[in-house]
Amino acid sequence: MIPETYSLVLTTDYRVPDPTRVWPLLQRRRDGLAALGAHHVFVYTSTTDPERVLVTIALETREPVAELLRSRAFIEWFDAVGVEDLPAVFAGELIEQFDFVADPTAAPTGIVVVGIMVVDDAPLFRAQVRETQDLFLKAGVRRVRIFEAFDDPREVMFLHELSDEVSAGRWLNRPDVAAEWFSDAGVGAYPPLFIGRFAHMMRIGDGNGTGS
């Protein structure tokens, strides 16, 4: 989903009445995103909730995050797309990645499953993921990413990319997978598990944007 060079991210997960408005608004705010240190933006649309969107902004450094969250432009952007409640926001860095595709830098083409959660023992969680690589591969998982929150090492964003919706459904319906990897997703202030498809990618600075 995200190549290794995009190691610092700001992810927002929210519901809007019309998800098609999100991409044009992001494009119009390209200069503002560049000023805050963003170099790529990824947009995903949910396959289970027609009003749900996940946006990941890849950053050059950590420093702009607090500034971005406090900025008037950040709040105004959510108002513009119709967000009624401020969404869940995850800011963190890549700490673990696995690729089961020939070209790990290729744009995502399948289904992404994203869970934001708190784990009791982050190093143990990472070790368990490493030990389960064969299971991921057999299940049709194409990429795995683990991001650690800047302000809490126990808070992680756990991302899988699978080849299609059928593979994703089989993966999520496995009792062992649901219990071990996603049981804490959606608990407390964290959003429910996000299941969606890549829609758009913007490269900040070169004027290019792509979409499905």
Would you name each region that the model predicts?
Residues 1-212:
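Short S/T/G/P-rich N-terminal loop/turn motif that feeds into the first structured element of a domain
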